Amino acid sequence: MTQPAPFVSDPEILSGAVCFTGTRVPVSALMDYLQAGDRIDDFLDDFPTVSREQVGAVLRLAGEAVMQHARSA
């Protein structure tokens, strides 16, 4: 059984911003927290509708995208 995508973009939710699946929390909020030096636990405390598994999946996908970009450069 495949896991649902950790994020979606729906024009009806936050004008199509990429959000964690099943929430109205934009993935950019996680990136903002991390760039500010905040911990993942802080993000999860502030956005309880997002699961740790969703955060992990987004970070894995972001890491894979960076590696793929580096290989193609």
Predicted ranges, named:
Residues 2-41:
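A short, structured beta-strand/loop element
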Residues 25-73:
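Long, charge-rich, low-complexity alpha-helical segments
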